[in-house]
Amino acid sequence: MRGKAFAVQNAKQKAKTTKPRRKEELIHMKFTVEKRLLNEAVTNLQRAVSTKTSIPALEGILIRSEENRLILTAYDLEIGMQTELPAIISAPGAIILTAKLFAEIVRRSPDEDITIDVDDRNTATITSGVSCFTIIGMDSAEFPELPKITDADTIKMPQELLKSMIR
């Protein structure tokens, strides 16, 4: 009992002496994206997410925001997928979010734009309408780089065309 009381008192004392930071100082990344587009992308990317791995970053989706787009990547060391979405970027950056949890949050969010704020401790706040979720992410540096295809011819095609060809 005494140990708990001391810990609580010590925590209160630290809280009093720690200078609170302003919210804008904590923002590491911030963007807004259409829910429908994000939901489709995350659902597709889950196919390349590893479910049983000793590398925690592979259980997540790497989210990078730059210019006017999001780049989402999933990779299980055998299959890698990457997709881009248009987005409103307030602060560029990158984070890894656990794919299963992130997909569930996006799926259950209201049909409104989704805003994601990430602070300097990789805490992501996901807001849509009146819904607000906070999850802990991982540093983007932990995500392995996708292999580069160098000596091959490449083509670009619309996603829907590729899907229809595979079916």
Spell out what each predicted region is.
Residues 3-167:
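Structural preference for solvent-exposed beta-strand-turn elements
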